[in-house]
Structure formats: C-alpha cells, structure tokens
Swiss-Prot record:
GO terms for biological process: lipid catabolic process. This is GDSL esterase/lipase At2g04020. Keywords: Glycoprotein, Hydrolase, Lipid degradation, Lipid metabolism, Secreted, Signal. Gene3D superfamilies: SGNH hydrolase. Residues 1-26 form the signal peptide. The active site is at 50 (nucleophile), 296, 299. Belongs to the 'GDSL' lipolytic enzyme family. Transmembrane segments: none annotated. Its EC number is 3.1.1.-. It is found in: Secreted. Glycans are attached at residue 260. One of its GO terms (molecular function) is hydrolase activity, acting on ester bonds.
C-alpha cells in the first residue's frame, strides 16, 4: 500500500532503517537529501513509543515508566526523566544535530509553558502503538491517534499565539521536522501465531497512513519515519544489523569497544507478562556507554543512540530518503 495520492507530491519521507541498511550518499545529492542533511528546521515534533518517550508516561496511570534509577544515570544531572535509557534518546540526538533544544514531554508542561515553546513538542508514550488499545492492559498511554490529537491541540491552543499571521504559522509547520517511531508494540501486544501477517500489517499501515494524512492536513510536510523492528529474537537481530550498519570510521571508534551486544546493562524486574525493565535503584554494568548496545532488554543505551545518529547524519549509512 502506497501513500495516499494527495500526499505523494508533498511529503519528504525519511526512513531510519534498523533492518535494511543501505548507503544513500552520492556525489550528487538530491534536493531531498540536501534538506535532510543540511536542513535548518525551526521545530521538531515527535510522535512515538518508549524509544523516544522523554517522560510523558510519568504523568499517566501506567505500569510502563522509566522515571526511576538506574534510568537516566548518564543523562544531564544523572536524573531519571522517564527516558528508557541511561541517557539521551535518538530523538534527543536529532534535536542536537539540528541545533534545537531537547524536545520536552508535552504532558509535563503547564499551559503557560506550552504557550512559549515554538521549537517542538514530544508526544511519545511508552507502551502505546498504532492501535487504540495497544498498551492499555498496563494502564493509560497515548495512542497514535491521541498523539496526533495533542499536536492539533498544540496548534490551536498554543502555537497560534507565537505567530502574527496564519501564513507564518503554516510556514513554520511546513518547514518543521516530524518524527514517528511507532508500531512495534502493536505486534508485541496483539500479534500471535494465528494472526494473518499480511492482514495485520495492512491494518496497521492503513491506520498509520490515515494519521500521516491528518498531520499533513494540519500542516506537516517533512517526516522522519522509523521502521518497525523485528520481534522474536529481538536483541540478536537488532545487534547484528546494528553492527553491520555502523561500520564507518566514526562509529567504528565506538563499536570496536563493545563487550556485550545482546544482553541488557541493568538487572531486570520482569513481571512475567507486560514488560521487562530495570529493577529500581539497581546497580548497572560499570560503563554502559562503552560496553553495551542495550540498557534494558528492549531499549538502547545512550551510546547506541549516539552511534545511530552518527551513522544516519554523518556517515549516511542507515538513513534513506524517498
């Protein structure tokens, strides 16, 4: 299934692939590649799940949270912000690359504070997905539909106060970057051996594209879309493709020192059904940012996120522009 015809001529789709690693750099970069690698985005809006949640779930009644040590041990000030990592996420590094502030969790801001921010918002919610019911067994979370609704709320209630005319607001949105990292939890919670793989994928793609279309109607034009990673032998497959994709001179400096490419850095607190995360205030491996790809069984260390950003933007080996 392709993009709705009304979108094809307007969207810049940037795929960060953790599976199909391919080099897109050429001696004559396309206009789209120039936008990606040399762009000057005024704002960065993030929609997604736990890979990029900066703390929205801290403000929701849910079991899926990361607002306690050892999460955040290497973040600024050693604070557990709600990020499912020892430090920064890939969304943080994208913001840094484009010289933007780290994008704040929407639910963690007062209305007055939201009125003052025009450099982006993060609506990502750990455990949630494309389907409305995904992750709800663990409590409340923000589905794809809800996150898009919150972006619409951002425009109507907050962004309009920052721009003198509707034209200025439209230009702001048209030149901003929108990241989506969502879909793997739909498989984790709902996919079984009895599920028809093609039908399930078609359903998710249809729902996803409907929300992309809504974002487009609201003014979004440039998208950074993260591919869904595989389930099953998750750590082994991701680690293998991670090492294959990060073979440039810069990433080799870091990857050559990795001691554990599949195991988590922190002791686990496994509830048997919903999620596996770090035990509260547990001791982690001594140097997660030099030895491990995974901080817990499903989420990368700050080092891994940093290496992804280098491979995407500097070495240009894992990002593909279409």
């Amino acid at each position: 299934m392709g993009l709705p015809s009304s979108l094809e001529s307007y969207l810049l789709l940037i795929l960060l692939s953790f599976l199909n690693v391919s080099t897109i750099y050429s001696s004559k970069p396309s206009k789209e590649e120039a936008v990606l690698f040399g762009g000057n985005f005024p704002a960065f809006y993030v929609i997604g799940d736990s890979l990029v949640d900066p703390g929205n779930n801290n403000h929701l009644p849910t079991m899926i949270r990361a607002n306690y040590p050892p999460y955040g041990s290497d973040f600024e000030g050693g604070k557990a912000t709600g990020r499912f990592s020892n430090g920064k996420t890939i969304a943080d590094y994208i913001a840094i690359y484009y010289k933007l502030p780290l994008v704040p969790a929407y639910l963690g801001l007062s209305d007055d504070r939201k009125d003052t921010i025009s450099t982006g918002m993060n609506y990502a919610s750990a455990g949630c997905g494309i389907r409305r019911l995904t992750g709800k067994i663990a409590g409340k979370c923000l589905s794809l539909s809800k996150q898009v609704d919150l972006f619409e709320e951002t425009i109507e209630k907050h962004l309009k106060t920052n721009f003198k005319t509707p034209y200025e607001l439209r230009e702001h949105l048209a030149h901003s970057l929108f990241m989506t990292v969502i879909g793997v939890n739909d498989y984790a919670f709902f996919y079984t051996r009895l599920t028809d793989a093609n039908d399930f994928a078609d359903e998710l793609l249809h729902k996803f594209l409907k929300k992309i279309e809504k974002l487009h109607k609201l003014g979004a034009r440039k998208f950074f879309i993260n591919n869904i990673k595989p389930l099953g032998c998750y750590p082994n497959i991701v680690a293998k493709t991670f090492m294959l994709g990060l073979r440039g001179p810069s990433t080799n400096r870091y990857s050559s020192n990795l001691l554990n490419t599949t195991g988590p850095c922190c002791p686990l607190d496994y509830d048997g059904s919903l999620t596996s995360s770090c035990k509260r205030r547990s001791k982690t491996c001594k140097a997660p940012d030099s030895t491990h790809i995974f901080f817990d069984p499903r989420h990368p260390t700050q080092l891994a996120n940093f290496m992804y950003s280098i491979a995407c933007f500097d070495e240009r080996t894992i990002c593909h522009v279409v």
